[in-house]
């Protein structure tokens, strides 16, 4: 039987998620684009930002801040990866570029159309 405290916490968390999604959706497109550009600028300014290898991002959904501005400006030696959910719920990563095929996973999230076993683990990144 679920613990009543954890159930209350879960209900509060779900309510907060709904509220934040509504706030994100209410932002005008210009504000979302400006936010994405500002985030990209800040990411590139990080002192530990890599020049080569892999970086993981996400497919922005439901008002989340987009990473496209950042992804399109990555240095040539840096490969952008999106999460791929394996059948065992393990999160893996696969290289992705605009135009590459995407499929919708069981949660409705677009991910690269690859066999999850052929994708990268977090430690491979």
Predicted segment positions?
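N-terminal active-site beta-alpha-beta segment that forms phosphate/nucleotide-binding
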Residues: 2-121
